[in-house]
Amino acid sequence: MSSTALKSGKISAYAAVKVDPDGDYCTPGAFDLERLFWKGSPKYTHVNEVWPNLYIGDEKTALDRYSLEKAGFTHILNAAHGRWNVDTGPEYYSDMNIEYHGVEADDLPTFNLSPFFYSAAEFIHTALQNETSKILVHCAMGRSRSAALVLAYLMIYKNMTVVDAIDQVLQHRCILPNRGFLKQLRELDIKLALERRDNMNGTNSSEKTGTSTETEI
């Protein structure tokens, strides 16, 4: 990806992008991101710990109040909140010592999950500030919506690239965010890379590029 394209803010979703010309890392294109999931992952199970005290699970896990309490979960992030999805809400856990956060998202490539990246990541980060906390991030299958939000958390708060975040989670769980979510995570990767570069240079990314990045579908 040329510097001209990066400065214009128009970025092809299928081209690799190198934000730091002096660095080795390139944000992969959308197809290359999908290929990361081809190398295999653990057999699908209902719930897995993918980072210390951070778990990704499915609807069955979220509905099993007894097992949640027995396992010591203190926080739940439902990435499929809403009447037509996994309709739990804070009321479902009202008599339990569980803090709930809901994201009403559809598992569709056309759904824009990115507005929820930072709020969901903050919820996870705040929960994990207490070393006794355990957080479950779930959707219906625990593979796409919930996985995308956990990947965003690792990128935002743990300074991982999208590639590193995917590798981290794939070591522990079978995930496959839909192509639309992968494109949005790719945009986040570029944004965070710009911020890291400009923090090192003492400049503001929006001032340097003149605009925000926008992926061409």
From Swiss-Prot:
It comes from the Eukaryota. Residues 46-194 form the Tyrosine-protein phosphatase domain. One of its GO terms (molecular function) is protein serine/threonine phosphatase activity. It is found in: Cytoplasm; Nucleus. It catalyses: O-phospho-L-tyrosyl-[protein] + H2O = L-tyrosyl-[protein] + phosphate; O-phospho-L-seryl-[protein] + H2O = L-seryl-[protein] + phosphate; O-phospho-L-threonyl-[protein] + H2O = L-threonyl-[protein] + phosphate. One of its GO terms (cellular component) is cytoplasm. One of its GO terms (biological process) is protein dephosphorylation. Substrate binds at residues 138-145. Disulfide bonds: none annotated. It holds the Pfam family DSPc. Keywords: Cytoplasm, Hydrolase, Nucleus, Protein phosphatase. The active site is at 139 (phosphocysteine intermediate). Its EC number is 3.1.3.16, 3.1.3.48. Gene3D superfamilies: Protein tyrosine phosphatase superfamily. Dual specificity phosphatase able to dephosphorylate phosphotyrosine, phosphoserine and phosphothreonine residues within the same substrate, with a preference for phosphotyrosine as a substrate. Involved in the modulation of AMPK and MAPK1/2 signaling pathways. Belongs to the protein-tyrosine phosphatase family. Non-receptor class dual specificity subfamily. This is Dual specificity phosphatase 29. It comes from Anolis carolinensis. The lineage of its organism: Eukaryota, Metazoa, Chordata, Craniata, Vertebrata.
